[in-house]
Amino acid sequence: MNGEPFLLEPYQVRFLNDRSVFRLVNKSRQIGFSTIIGGETVQKAAVRPSYKANIISINQKEAADKIEIAGNLYHSIPDDFSESDPPLKPVLWTNANDEISFHRPPHTSSIISQPASAAVRGGRKDIYFDEFAHIRDAVKLYRAAMPAITRGDSRLTIISTPLGQSGLFYDIASNVEAYPEYSRHAVPWWECSAMVVPEKYDEALALASQVEGSEERVLAYGTDKLHVIYNGFGGDLIGFQTEYEATFADEATAYFTWDLIVNCTDSELPVLREWNPNYESTGFISIGVDLAKERDQTVFTVIEHNDDGGAKVLFTRDTQDEYHEQFAYLKTLITATRANRVTIDQTGVGQTFTEDAKRLLPGVNVEGVVFTNAKKEKWATTFKGDMQTGRVSWPNIPNLRRQIHGIKRTKTEANFYRFAGPADDYFWSLMLGLYGEGRVPARMSFLGEQ
């Protein structure tokens, strides 16, 4: 792979040697399981005529990546193996975005990779769910997959980074009595040699799990790059443990559960680094601006509202630039998105920012909002209702999703509810963009228009 020998890690060997019909892998991010899925399915398709495998991913891009990996693995097999008995490099029959197949008909073996859909029905095949905990309607798809493995030696494999202590992935991973048929693999970051200081890898395999505290573990065994990744979570310990330590987040105090968040995540929506200037809106556009307080970051969120009452997040951007640079960026973003409403956190430093926006951005509906417990409670409860009824969606933006899950509802001494999270700038930017002061945005003229 990538012109270098492909060496299997111990956890990959364990997985490939697991002959269970039902397998579950609870894993860290970026540890190479897409490659292992590709390797296992290519090997089977190469040596077993009429073999079928169906790989289900969270979106079309992820699905296409699996086929690309399978193709690369196939082409890495030396041509000399085409003449072996049996041939270990069979004829490549199909090589499309969603399918790769080997052997000539009528004994063609195929690997089909698709985004999550009911297309998993029909035919005897091996089924692989990749990032299962992040798939919308996972229970429905899981049930639809069962008939495909009923006969013969077909198998079902579920692989994912974890989310919260809820949902089918958590149930199967944690409840051995209810799902005794599953083998279970837990793979945290310290089992992946790419994330561990080379001379400490063997020690990490033996002792890292016994270290108390994620930060201490990262400092003791992690590479410099992993240190940067850990610091990038900005103190969100639960987020790091979920993404890299195969730990399920406690749902007991979460106001928004992971099940709810996943079902509102549209993984086909692009995660944009910059706003797409060619985007043509079919509704009206609002922008929420949560301004930085001391060590926090400012977050801009662009939302499209449709006539049917639905809303979807199109774009988010965080920054710690100086305020004058943030203001210049907001002006550019308003022009590019043709925003109908801009709602800014007017609390504290936001007062001057909001006044400048109203004065210097003519023709734009700018409103400032002072945060109060009452406003936050109204937004959070309205938002939860919109999530439950499917009226709001967003791309798979990790910071946004983690912060939504991090919001806790606690009761104050004054008997009011308080909504907050350890890091919540993305969340409040989202609330400002979605709801603002609650007034219906009007169609406005735009900067630069006459």
Give each language-model segment a name.
Residues 20-41:
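Walker A/P-loop
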Residues 194-289:
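ATPase catalytic-site recognition across NTP-hydrolyzing enzymes
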Residues 88, 136-224, 353-360, 365-368:
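ASCE P-loop NTPase helicase motor core
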Residues 103-105, 188, 273-281, 296-346:
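Nucleic-acid-processing active sites and adjacent nucleic-acid-binding tracks
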Residues 68-125:
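Inter-Walker segment of RecA-like/P-loop motor cores
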